[in-house]
């Protein structure tokens, strides 16, 4: 079997036209054997065709053309009166039809034929003109030749001459009914097909093409020659436009009247229309089969006739039209979709809709014709199965319908190619006129529509980041419709994977004019440069959707199969993105949508590093997923990894030689990151499939045995915000500001005065050397101040806080917390929840408020420890002894428990519970030192070591000492409680005022309150070495820098 390759380039189009006949052979071969058997059994006949002109029939150019055309074709012309008497046109009652049976054989009746021709305007206009007589003769000759060939084929199995002779001799021949039904069938077929085409010329041309194709097949030369003899019809390689016109006319009926009908409605209407069109044919087929049954002497009534009719109707299936209806639906949808972009100068969606409409027309026409053929074949097949017709007739009908279907299928591809070529010509004409790539213009139109909808979005970004300008780089990615049009028109090597645009919004009003020129000034997507050095005013740079890696695309089309082509993509990529920041204004740079990884065909990962050289003002940088170098310059600069897809961080400043210098390693294994990939779009043009490769992206995981990492270099960066994973921070010898963000983070400040934020997650934070501020945030955190005077804030959750060796402030926040002051004079504020507090060495201050939960205070050293009841009067509290513990109660609940208040330090007891806890939670490097310190304390009882808080102060400055409390309990021996009244009397006797409610305060109270204020101020002063001077960019989402200052002010007010 010959192999034919369809064209994918216009240079191959001419060769393709000559190969259509070969493809027709392939479809015909399947029916070849059956048809040969049928012809062998039927034998040859001696039929002839006569054109009958009745006496006194009007004359004119039309009749002249009929006569001359018939003579050219060898058709006998019989003039009534001139050539003999009137013919007996009543044989078989076939008179007054286009085709009948007379004593001279098959007869075309001139009045009916002339009337039929006159009904076709295209033909009748030519026939009726004297000046076009020669042309008219040719046209009529086409018609008569077509009918002659059609009749010769249809009656190849009938000896009509013998039938006529027998009928004239009065013999009762049962084949008479068969012949009559056959003529009725042929008349209906001719009428139906001509009414569908509405153009007898093109109808003749199609039969001529059928004959030419058959003429190239062995054993079909005789049949093919008859059809090829039609004059001036051209060869098979031409006339695709005419064929398209024929199919357009046929499909007009299938489109139906209601253009707004949905798919289901159209499918149903198509079935109804088909039944109407084929109704007479189905009736004629049924009559023909019943006549065959009568000829065999069998019954023609009842179930048999119904069976045949039902088989014929079942062959006409509405399902065959459903797919076509969907094509028209899509064509209508594309036309509607195109309206949005036509105003921006792009008509490609409409062109694509035209392709689906025109190819749908072809499919509709061919489906209609095949439905007719299927109905005929089904009816004959049903009769043949019931022994109603002879096997030769069944074989002949089957073979002929198969041949016609095969040739129609072969010609359909040629029609599709022709339609695609017409669209390609329109695209080329547009490009010649405007000097621009048509498909790039499509991307431009898509982006213009996007901008029309996005002004509000840009204003929202400007408000969010508090900058004057918004500069957005938008990647218009691969568009399936634009790609499909490129593939169908064989322009797959001329389309890009998309186009990147720069849009500039200043003060919420102006989008940059001459956007193409502006884009080129800012962005070079081939070299990988982004330059904002010419922008004035504070600016946000953002990427609204993922930007493809920098590089140049190259495409080449090759054939990959008989009907398959592939347009392969090669990218000459760059290894870096280089960004120049806004020089003299604040900038926000969001690189989280910048694609920095590309996956090759062999599954290797290529990385495009980002190098950002920023300006002299305050900058805020959101990092993407790939390796990044940030040279932040002067100003207060923040690098933020919190937008995700950055992997778990290890931030290391231990080897820094300058402030703000960090190395960052990121583990991307198991992290979803943006990856550039090569995707394929399949486009179909009939049997031909084109695969177009294009760059795409996906958000996916990297799983590798060795791990996949990114490496960053940060220079002149004042603040770093971590990722959503478990990060590790190692500070420098300079002042560091770290935010853990989400995840269970590990943060070490090391040297310098650091601000360390755990944020969300169960974090562990170590201040190291220097006066540090540690913020746990949400989660169950562990905070260690270590060296220096530190501020520790546990935040939400059940936290563990240790102050270290300086004067520290410890705030538990909400949750059930544990606070250990360790060495130095510390301030411990447990906050809400049931907390445990131990001041450790030094003179410590505890803070309690009435909204707090149950606090437990363990105190072992210092002789000037204080408890501040910040918003509670002493007159509202009572004390209760519970074993060796002292309970402070207010509002009938235990507010504070003083552990071991009534016990004395025991030198033989070894390490007490407090000391054991300290060792348990202390950093490993401090444990040996603390243990030796505790051991030195054993064996001696220092009066300065006790388990008491020496002074308790109410909100108005009223006070009571530990000695006062002990005295009240001692007077009664086994006394268990001290009432508010007893406390009131004690306080009254200690001061000069007559009442706790007096507006004047005793000098003693004022002195004590002043002492508390001084102590608090001293601790605040010690821990305020860093924090108030540090600032964060206004765009920072983590505004926690003022926590310490707010709390310090609150403490001062309380004191």
Swiss-Prot record:
Keyword set includes Transcription regulation: no
InterPro entries linked to this entry: Hemolysin-typ_Ca-bd_CS (IPR018511), Hemolysn_Ca-bd (IPR001343), RTX_pore_form (IPR018504), RTX_toxin/Mannuronan_C5-epim (IPR050557), RTX_toxin_determinant-A (IPR003995), Serralysin-like_metalloprot_C (IPR011049)
Region Disordered: which residues? 795-815, 990-1009
The record describes its post-translational modification as: Acylated at Lys-562 and Lys-687 by LtxC. This modification is required for full activity. Isolated methyl esters contain palmitoyl and palmitolyl fatty acyl groups with smaller quantities of myristic and stearic fatty acids.
Which Pfam families does this one have? Answer: HemolysinCabind (PF00353), RTX (PF02382)
Q: What induces it?
A: Levels of toxin expression vary greatly among strains. Highly leukotoxic strains (JP2-type strains) produce more LtxA protein and ltx mRNA than minimally leukotoxic strains (652-type strains). Variations are probably due to different types of promoters. Expression is not affected by iron.
Q: Give the membrane topology, semicolon-separated if more than one.
A: Peripheral membrane protein
- What biological-process terms (Gene Ontology) are attached? killing of cells of another organism
Bilayer-crossing regions: none
Reading the lineage from the top rank, the first entry is Bacteria
Q: Which UniProt keywords apply?
A: Calcium, Cell outer membrane, Coiled coil, Cytolysis, Hemolysis, Membrane, Repeat, Secreted, Toxin, Virulence
Keyword RNA-binding in the entry? The reply is: no
Q: Where is this region: Cholesterol recognition/amino acid consensus (CRAC) region?
A: 334-340, 502-506
Q: List, in alphabetical order, the Gene Ontology terms for molecular function in this entry.
A: calcium ion binding; channel activity; toxin activity
Renumbered to this chain, the Low complexity biased-composition regions fall at 993-1006
Q: Which family does the record claim for this protein?
A: Belongs to the RTX prokaryotic toxin (TC 1.C.11) family.
Q: Assembly state and interactors?
A: Interacts specifically with the superoxide dismutase [Cu-Zn]. This interaction may protect LtxA from reactive oxygen species and reactive nitrogen species produced by host inflammatory cells during disease. Interacts with the human leukocyte adhesion glycoprotein LFA-1 (ITGAL-ITGB2).
Q: What is known of its domains?
A: The Gly-rich region is probably involved in binding calcium, which is required for target cell-binding or cytolytic activity.
Q: What does this protein do?
A: Virulence factor that plays an important role in immune evasion. Lyses human lymphocytes and monocytes. Binds to the LFA-1 integrin on the surface of the host cell and to cholesterol-containing membranes, which probably results in large LtxA-LFA-1 clusters in lipid rafts. Also shows beta-hemolytic activity on certain types of growth media.
User: What is this protein's name?
Assistant: Leukotoxin
Record organism? Aggregatibacter actinomycetemcomitans
């Amino acid at each position: 079997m010959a192999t034919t390759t369809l064209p994918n380039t216009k240079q191959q189009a001419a060769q393709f036209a000559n190969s259509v006949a070969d493809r027709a052979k392939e479809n015909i071969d399947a029916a070849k054997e059956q048809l040969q058997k049928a012809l062998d059994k039927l034998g040859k006949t001696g039929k002839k065709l006569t054109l009958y002109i009745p006496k006194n029939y009007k004359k004119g150019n039309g009749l002249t053309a009929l006569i001359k055309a018939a003579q050219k074709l060898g058709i006998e012309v019989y003039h009534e009166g001139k050539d003999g008497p009137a013919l007996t046109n009543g044989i078989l009652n076939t008179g007054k039809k286009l085709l009948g049976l007379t004593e001279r054989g098959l007869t075309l009746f001139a009045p009916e034929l002339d009337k039929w021709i006159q009904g076709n305007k295209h033909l009748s206009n030519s026939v009726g003109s004297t000046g076009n007589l020669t042309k008219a003769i040719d046209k009529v000759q086409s018609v008569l030749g077509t009918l002659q060939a059609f009749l010769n084929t249809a009656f190849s199995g009938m000896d009509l001459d013998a039938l006529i002779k027998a009928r004239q001799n009065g013999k009762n021949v049962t084949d008479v009914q068969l012949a009559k039904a056959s003529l009725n069938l042929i008349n209906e077929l001719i009428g139906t097909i001509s009414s569908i085409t509405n153009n007898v010329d093109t109808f003749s041309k199609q039969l001529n093409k059928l004959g030419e194709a058959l003429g190239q097949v062995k054993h079909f030369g005789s049949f093919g020659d008859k059809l090829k003899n039609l004059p001036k019809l051209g060869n098979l390689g031409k006339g695709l436009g005419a064929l398209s016109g024929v199919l357009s006319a046929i499909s007009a009926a299938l489109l139906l009247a209601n253009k707004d009908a949905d798919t289901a409605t159209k499918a149903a209407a198509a079935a109804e229309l088909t039944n109407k069109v084929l109704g007479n044919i189905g009736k004629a087929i049924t009559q023909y089969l019943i006549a065959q049954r009568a000829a065999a002497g069998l019954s023609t009534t009842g179930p048999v006739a119904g069976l045949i009719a039902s088989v014929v109707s079942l062959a006409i299936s509405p399902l065959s039209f459903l797919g076509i209806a969907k094509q028209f639906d899509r064509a209508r949808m594309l036309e509607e979709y195109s309206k949005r972009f036509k105003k921006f100068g792009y008509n490609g969606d409409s062109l694509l809709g035209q392709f689906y409409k025109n190819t749908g027309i072809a499919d509709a026409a061919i489906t209609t014709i095949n439905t007719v053929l299927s109905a005929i074949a089904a009816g004959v097949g049903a009769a043949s199965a019931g022994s109603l017709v002879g096997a030769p007739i069944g074989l002949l009908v089957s073979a002929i319908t198969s041949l016609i279907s095969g040739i129609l299928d072969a010609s359909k591809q040629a029609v599709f190619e022709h339609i695609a070529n017409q669209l390609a010509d329109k695209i080329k004409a547009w490009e010649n006129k405007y000097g621009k790539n048509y498909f790039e213009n499509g991307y431009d139109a898509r982006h213009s529509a996007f901008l029309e909808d996005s002004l509000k979005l840009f204003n929202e970004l400007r408000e969010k980041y508090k900058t004057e300008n918004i500069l957005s780089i938008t990647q218009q990615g691969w568009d399936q419709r634009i790609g499909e049009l490129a593939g169908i028109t064989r322009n797959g090597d001329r389309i890009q994977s998309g186009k990147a645009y720069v849009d500039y919004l200043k003060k919420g009003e102006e989008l940059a004019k001459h956007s193409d020129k502006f884009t080129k000034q800012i962005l070079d997507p081939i070299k990988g440069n982004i330059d904002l050095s010419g922008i004035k005013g504070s600016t946000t740079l953002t990427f609204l959707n993922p930007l493809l890696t920098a590089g140049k695309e190259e495409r080449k089309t090759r054939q990959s199969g008989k009907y398959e082509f592939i347009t392969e993509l090669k990218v000459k990529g760059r290894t870096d993105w280089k960004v120049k920041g806004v020089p003299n204004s604040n900038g926000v740079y969001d690189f989280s949508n910048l694609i920095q990884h590309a996956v090759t065909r062999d599954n290797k990962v290529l990385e495009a590093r980002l190098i950002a050289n920023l300006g002299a003002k305050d900058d805020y940088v959101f990092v993407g997923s790939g390796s990044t170098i940030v040279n932040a310059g002067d100003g207060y600069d923040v690098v933020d990894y919190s937008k995700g897809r950055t992997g778990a961080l290890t931030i290391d400043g231990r080897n820094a030689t300058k402030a703000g210098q960090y190395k960052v390693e990121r583990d991307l294994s198991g992290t979803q990151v943006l990856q550039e990939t090569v995707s394929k779009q399949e486009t179909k043009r009939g049997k031909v499939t084109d695969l177009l490769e294009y760059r795409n992206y996906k958000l996916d995981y990297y799983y590798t045995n060795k791990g996949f990492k990114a490496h960053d270099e940060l220079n002149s960066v004042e603040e770093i915000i971590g990722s959503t994973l478990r990060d590790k921070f190692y500070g420098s010898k300079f002042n560091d500001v770290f935010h853990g963000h989400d995840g269970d983070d590990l943060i070490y400040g090391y040297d310098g005065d650091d601000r360390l934020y755990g944020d969300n997650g169960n974090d562990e934070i170590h201040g190291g050397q220097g006066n540090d501020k540690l913020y746990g945030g949400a989660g169950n955190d562990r905070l260690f101040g270590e060296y220096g005077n530190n501020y520790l804030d546990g935040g939400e959750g059940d936290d563990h806080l240790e102050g270290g060796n300086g004067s520290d402030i410890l705030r538990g926040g909400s949750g059930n917390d544990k606070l250990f002051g360790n060495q130095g004079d510390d301030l411990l504020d447990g906050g809400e929840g049931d907390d445990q507090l131990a001041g450790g060495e030094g003179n410590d201050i505890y803070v309690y408020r009435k909204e707090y939960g149950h606090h437990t205070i363990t105190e072992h050293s210092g002789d000037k420890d204080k408890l501040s009841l910040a918003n509670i009067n002493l007159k509202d509290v009572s004390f209760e002894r519970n074993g060796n513990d002292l309970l402070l109660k207010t509002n009938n609940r235990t507010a504070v428990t003083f552990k071991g208040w009534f016990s004395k330090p025991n030198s033989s007891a070894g390490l007490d519970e407090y000391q054991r806890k300290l060792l348990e939670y202390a950093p490993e490097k401090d444990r040996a030192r603390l243990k030796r310190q505790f051991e030195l304390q054993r064996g001696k009882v220092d009066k300065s070591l006790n388990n008491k808080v020496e002074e308790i102060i109410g909100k108005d400055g009223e006070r009571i000492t530990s000695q006062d409390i002990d005295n009240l309990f001692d007077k009664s021996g086994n006394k268990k409680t001290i009432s508010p009244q007893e406390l009131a009397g004690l306080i009254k006797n200690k001061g000069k005022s007559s009442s706790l409610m007096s507006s004047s305060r005793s000098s003693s109270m004022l002195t004590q309150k002043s002492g508390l204020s001084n102590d608090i101020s001293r601790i605040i002063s010690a821990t305020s070495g860093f924090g108030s001077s540090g600032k964060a960019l206004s765009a920072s989402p983590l505004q926690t820098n003022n926590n310490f200052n707010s709390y310090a002010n609150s403490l001062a007010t309380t004191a």
